Amino acid sequence: MKKIVIKIGGNAATQLTPAFFDTIKFWQKQHYKIAIVHGGGDTISALMSQLNEPVQKINGIRFTTQNGINITKMALLGQVQPALLESCRVNGLSVIGLNAASDQLLTGHTIDQDTFGYVGNIHQVNTKLIHNLWEKNLIPIIAPMAITNSGQWLNVNADHAATALAKYLKADELYLLTDVSGVKIKGNVLQNLTSKTMEELQKKQMITGGMIPKVNSALFAARHGVRAVHITNTVTHPGTIVTI
């Protein structure tokens, strides 16, 4: 049973192509098991601005207050996820929306509360829930938030949430979908990228900006047993395959 985790951007509900849905349906006919994690950063920022909540980023991480958590839940669970579920339904996929509170799906801890507020990483996944849904031929669509053991909601980077899910589900493949076709060096997409090559390219400042945490997330997944991690803009193209 092949298991595939896909991370898509929060605005992907309006950008996913017919080829995306056709590929997912083809995989399901091959009895592949699929889980999708969605982002939503732009929607969160827009809603924060509307509600006069300061948007502050530290080293690329959104500082999140308790009010910020409430707004994040409104954006992800009230706007982004419903739009994505509807898009999948219209295109013939049987999906179900999940969040951290769905039978304790995602348990996490803060990474540095003094610096980042209620931002965390995931250290436990209720994989039994996912497997039960897979047995019913449902595709879980999961919001990137976690809950601590004491019940505090946390904001989680969507790439990190997808890699954690892939790790605990022992996924065979992970797709980190982005707005470019892969990791580009001098305008050309790298077909393969290893941790050693990544270090060399970083030293030469040839991988910079937002691609660095994405590649690091991919390497984390590869180190934890995911055989193929793709950084790409579509599931129909392998993009850059990251391995250890």
UniProtKB/Swiss-Prot annotation:
Q: For binding substrate, which residues are annotated in this chain's numbering?
A: G40, G41, R62, N155
How is this protein annotated for GO cellular component?
cytoplasm
GO BP of this protein: arginine biosynthetic process via ornithine; L-arginine biosynthetic process
Primary residence: cytoplasm
Q: Which domain of life is it from?
A: Bacteria
Citing just one GO molecular function, the answer is: ATP binding
Looking up InterPro entries in the UniProt record yields: AceGlu_kinase-like_sf, AcgluKinase_fam, ArgB, Asp/Glu/Uridylate_kinase
Keyword vocabulary terms for this entry: Amino-acid biosynthesis, Arginine biosynthesis, ATP-binding, Cytoplasm, Kinase, Nucleotide-binding, Transferase
Q: NCBIfam families, from UniProt? A: argB
Which residues does this entry assign to the site Transition state stabilizer?
K7, K214
PANTHER family of this UniProt entry?
N-ACETYLGLUTAMATE SYNTHASE (PTHR23342), N-ACETYLGLUTAMATE SYNTHASE, MITOCHONDRIAL (PTHR23342:SF0)
| Annotated EC | 2.7.2.8
Which pathway is it part of?
Amino-acid biosynthesis; L-arginine biosynthesis; N(2)-acetyl-L-ornithine from L-glutamate: step 2/4
HAMAP family per the UniProt record, alphabetical: ArgB (MF_00082)
Source organism phylogeny: Bacteria, Bacillati, Bacillota, Bacilli, Lactobacillales
Recorded catalytic activity of this chain's protein: N-acetyl-L-glutamate + ATP = N-acetyl-L-glutamyl 5-phosphate + ADP
Among the Pfam families in the record, one is AA_kinase
| Physiological role | Catalyzes the ATP-dependent phosphorylation of N-acetyl-L-glutamate.
Cellular compartments annotated: Cytoplasm
**Record's protein name:** Acetylglutamate kinase
Entry similarity comment: Belongs to the acetylglutamate kinase family. ArgB subfamily.
